[in-house]
């Protein structure tokens, strides 16, 4: 959290946050909002008031991941690649497979997780659109699982 606060207070930094859909749902339950309340809008407004320059939902990254995994499957099917294709957005599961099933690693999709894909888009496309050096973009991911920290670069 200290690094996030520091970035939010640095005028040179363009701070972007992405939030997993599960977090939005959990906030709605935690604050006992009735079903149908725009939790996403309230959360985005709160994050902007905290100083984030852009607020995104990770579901866009999930769409990118699905498209890339589909392309990877087609590529493997067309070129006698390793099957079955195993996909997972869970870094904890990937670590488990690396440790206990190294013989299956060729079956695991090479695609990034949704929050990694979205981070890559922010550091390239958004940086280009907003004319910001990618080194000045700080990407913050709010995820429901602590094992996502294994994916941080």
Where are these regions (language model features)?
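Iron-sulfur-associated redox domains of electron-transfer enzymes in respiratory
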Residues: 2-153
């Amino acid at each position: 959290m200290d690094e996030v606060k520091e970035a939010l207070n640095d005028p040179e930094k363009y701070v972007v946050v992405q939030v997993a859909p599960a977090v939005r749902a959990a906030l709605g339950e935690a604050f006992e909002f009735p079903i149908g309340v725009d939790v996403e809008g309230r959360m985005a407004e709160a994050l902007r008031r905290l100083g984030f320059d852009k607020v995104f939902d990770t579901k866009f990254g999930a769409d990118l991941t699905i498209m890339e995994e589909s392309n990877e499957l087609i590529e493997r099917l067309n070129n006698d690649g390793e099957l079955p294709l195993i996909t997972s957005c869970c870094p904890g599961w990937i670590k488990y497979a690396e440790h206990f099933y190294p013989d299956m690693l060729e079956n695991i999709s090479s695609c990034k997780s949704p929050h990694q894909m979205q981070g890559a888009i922010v550091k390239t496309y958004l940086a280009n659109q907003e004319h910001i050096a990618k080194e000045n973009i700080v990407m913050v991911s709010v995820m429901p699982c602590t094992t996502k920290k294994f994916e941080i670069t």
